[in-house]
């Protein structure tokens, strides 16, 4: 019996320090990404989403590192750890859903949704609205269910919780659905290869499915999973840290053409919109017509 607890304790510590290590590496990557996206790359409707997504990932990883260090020093986990980190995680999820859907619409309806035909600050306004709406969407259920303070009302908690579960399910479905649409129709039903931002949406959707969804599931089923699968939360946290840390590397690999390409050149090639080609809508290849 004691050996089982020892194995679980060791496994938990390994996941904890892996999450801390990945978060530290991701902080450096997202800081560089924010620097280049914020100061050295011309803004457009698509890379505006990625700039805000990098900011959300940076805040998520910063909270991970801060609360992890506090846990090491104090010897116990702060009660605010989960709601605060999940707040920035949810902002990133919402931004990723908006980015994927926008890429999908621009690919399907280039005549109406292309960057040149939309109001200039549409993406900026939408990102600011997402930041503003996510805070009450996460903090109100957390407060009602006793994550921010002691004491809770079961009926009020259930009402807020199922509301948050609904919008999280919708966001996850939008992001995954849009990325899968781009993956399938962009490769099978178009005579042209998908534009670079559509490819980034495809890769981000795959990362979301494998690395972000577990933490969403934990938020939705926290009491059950905490009792039945106590290892689920640290594992989901590690996967979420991997997702937030992998995006800068993904952008760099997508933009790199030569082995010795500098970071700024690769990121500008991957995220700059001045060289973005037309999104060209869906059409069947000639040999299928």
UniProtKB/Swiss-Prot annotation:
It is a multi-pass membrane protein. The gene is Mrgprg. The chain crosses the membrane at residues 14-34, 53-73, 79-99, 121-141, 165-185, 200-220, 223-243. It comes from the Eukaryota. SUPFAM superfamilies: Family A G protein-coupled receptor-like (SSF81321). CDD domains: 7tmA_MrgprG (cd15111). Residues 35-52, 100-120, 186-199, 244-289 are cytoplasmic. GO terms for molecular function: G protein-coupled receptor activity. This is Mas-related G-protein coupled receptor member G. Keywords: Cell membrane, G-protein coupled receptor, Membrane, Receptor, Transducer, Transmembrane, Transmembrane helix. InterPro entries: GPCR_Rhodpsn, MRGPCRFAMILY, MRGPCRG. Gene3D superfamilies: Rhodopsin 7-helix transmembrane proteins. Belongs to the G-protein coupled receptor 1 family. Mas subfamily. Orphan receptor. May regulate nociceptor function and/or development, including the sensation or modulation of pain. Signal peptide: none annotated. It is found in: Cell membrane. It comes from Mus musculus (Mouse). GO terms for cellular component: plasma membrane. Residues 1-13, 74-78, 142-164, 221-222 are extracellular.
């Amino acid at each position: 019996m004691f050996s089982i607890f020892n194995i679980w304790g060791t496994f938990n510590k390994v996941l904890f320090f892996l999450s801390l290590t990945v978060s530290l590496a991701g902080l450096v990557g997202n800081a560089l990404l924010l620097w280049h996206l914020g100061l050295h790359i011309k803004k457009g409707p698509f890379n505006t989403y990625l700039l805000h997504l990098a900011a959300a990932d940076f805040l998520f990883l910063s909270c991970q590192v801060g609360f992890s260090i506090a846990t090491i020093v104090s010897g116990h986990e702060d009660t605010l750890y989960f709601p605060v980190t999940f707040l920035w995680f949810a902002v990133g999820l919402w931004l990723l859903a908006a980015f994927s859907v926008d890429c999908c619409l621009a690919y399907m309806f280039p005549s109406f949704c292309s960057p040149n035909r939309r109001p200039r600050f549409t993406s900026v306004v939408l990102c600011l609205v997402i930041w503003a709406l996510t805070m009450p969407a996460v903090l109100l259920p957390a407060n009602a269910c006793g994550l921010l303070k002691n004491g809770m009302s079961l009926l009020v908690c259930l009402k807020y919780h199922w509301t948050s579960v609904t919008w999280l399910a919708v966001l996850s479905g939008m992001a995954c659905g849009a990325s899968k649409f781009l993956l399938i129709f962009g490769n099978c039903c178009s005579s042209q290869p998908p534009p670079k931002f559509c490819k980034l949406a495809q890769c981000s959707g795959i990362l979301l499915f494998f690395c972000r969804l577990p933490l969403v599931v934990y938020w939705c089923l926290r009491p059950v999973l905490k009792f039945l699968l106590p290892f689920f939360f640290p594992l989901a946290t590690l996967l979420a840290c991997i997702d937030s840390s992998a995006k800068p590397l993904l952008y760099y690999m997508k933009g790199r053409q030569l082995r010795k390409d500098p970071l700024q050149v690769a990121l500008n090639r991957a995220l700059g919109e001045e060289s973005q080609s037309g999104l060209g809508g869906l059409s069947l290849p000639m040999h299928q017509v």
